[in-house]
UniProtKB/Swiss-Prot annotation:
Pathway info: Carbohydrate degradation; pentose phosphate pathway; D-glyceraldehyde 3-phosphate and beta-D-fructose 6-phosphate from D-ribose 5-phosphate and D-xylulose 5-phosphate (non-oxidative stage): step 2/3
Described function: Transaldolase is important for the balance of metabolites in the pentose-phosphate pathway.
UniProt xrefs under SUPFAM superfamilies: Aldolase
Keyword Transferase appears in the UniProt entry: yes
Major location category of this protein: cytoplasm
Family: Belongs to the transaldolase family. Type 2 subfamily.
Subcellular location: Cytoplasm
Reaction equations catalysed: D-sedoheptulose 7-phosphate + D-glyceraldehyde 3-phosphate = D-erythrose 4-phosphate + beta-D-fructose 6-phosphate
Organism: Kocuria rhizophila (strain ATCC 9341 / DSM 348 / NBRC 103217 / DC2201)
Protein name: Transaldolase
Gene: tal
Pfam families in the cross-refs: TAL_FSA (PF00923)
Length: 368
């Protein structure tokens, strides 16, 4: 029998796990998910690493070595996280080779405290890439307005990028433009475009959570009927933007030079509203050449009972635009929501980074 995760894979969706820890690597758990649930990549973020480090057992030996060498907290965090990502890259190397670098990818985020400093973000992206030193690493850069030049600069150096925290269609267009600009500069720099890969991480459930809260405040029957629809509509329209970008002369010139398209990646796919199906943001966002990164709970639910019926995105654009228009008619501002979500997203990563630093600081102090 074909499993739901295999059906997703057959439909052109790459399944990535939105989690990483040393325990997951050393126990064989990640390899098991690769073997049984069609996992072909991993995404990480500061929140994930903060949770991993909170379970200190797997890191005790390395923390003791770092403490003995009088390593600073920032350097210790850098060493620990890049070591985990390098090991994960090695685990996924066969998949990366089999897919010519499309999958088998492991993402690591630049220090979120640098999100509003383009030059510092670009420098950190280069440092991460050089330190991990694996062709299947993806460097995550937030899609803030100030992050866009960093994306172009990083791609221009031949570094593969995961652009994260995308909430709005307008910002997504800016991300696509930054990727193409980076590829054009990489070509001028004599880089081999076929070795550069990118995904654009478009967040889904957080859009529903915020818009649904505002629809509840409106309280009309029309508003209630629109709940749980904004995230999917927004993501589906993002896929239309992606398709349109591939139809431009600018992209066709780059593709002829060997460039890889920047695939849409659906992030924030864990369902927050218990009244909605737990695989909603998986089964309703099936489209060719996409990635869905899932927390393990969503991955397991998908493997267990998701009903995958093929492409659920292509051809939904008019209907999706009508959903967003109807939400606007209820007095809910799309621009306000996406701006708020970007700000909150950065704040969450900042808080997680501080938590990560605090955890490592305490571990270093205990080992000294």
């Amino acid at each position: 029998m074909t499993t739901p995760t295999q059906k997703l894979s057959d439909a052109g969706v790459s399944i990535w796990l939105d989690d990483l820890s040393r325990q997951r690597l050393t126990s064989g758990n990640l390899q098991k998910l690769i073997d049984t649930e069609n996992v072909v990549g991993v995404t990480t973020n500061p929140t994930i690493f903060a949770a991993a480090l909170a379970d200190g057992e797997s890191y005790r030996e390395q923390v003791a070595e770092l403490a003995a060498a009088d390593t600073s907290v920032d350097d210790a965090v850098f060493r620990i996280t890049t070591d985990d990502v390098r090991d994960a890259c090695d685990l996924f190397a066969p998949i990366a080779e089999a897919t010519q670098g499309v999958d088998g990818r492991v993402s690591i985020e630049v220090d979120p405290r640098l999100a509003q400093d383009a030059d510092a973000t670009s420098a950190m992206a280069q440092k991460l890439s050089q330190t991990i030193d694996r062709p299947n690493a993806l460097i995550k850069i937030p899609a803030t307005e100030k992050g866009l030049p960093s994306i172009a600069a990083t791609v221009a150096e031949g570094i593969s990028v995961n652009v994260t925290l995308i909430f709005s269609l307008e910002r997504y267009r800016g991300v696509i433009n930054a990727y193409m600009e980076g590829l054009e500069r990489a070509l001028e720099n004599g880089k081999d475009l076929s070795t550069i890969h990118s995904v654009a991480s478009f967040f889904v459930s957080r859009v529903d959570t915020e818009i649904d809260k505002r629809l509840d405040a409106v309280g009309s029957s029309e508003a209630t009927a629109l709940k749980g629809k904004a995230g999917l509509a927004n993501a589906r329209l993002a896929y239309q933007v992606y398709e349109q970008s591939l139809d431009t002369e600018r992209w066709k010139r780059l593709a002829a030079a060997g460039a890889n398209p920047q695939r849409p990646l659906w992030a924030s796919t864990g369902v927050k509203d218990p009244s909605l199906p737990d695989t909603l943001y998986v089964t309703e966002l099936v489209a060719p050449n996409t990635v869905n990164t899932m927390p393990e709970k969503t991955l397991d639910a998908t493997f267990d009972h998701a009903e995958v019926t093929g492409d659920t995105v292509t051809g939904t654009y008019e209907q999706s635009a009508e959903v967003l228009d109807a939400i606007a008619e209820q007095g809910v501002s799309y621009q306000e929501v996406v701006a708020q979500l970007e700000t909150e997203g950065l704040q969450k990563f900042d808080a997680s980074w501080e938590e990560l630093l605090s955890t490592v600081r305490a571990a270093l102090d205990a080992a000294r």
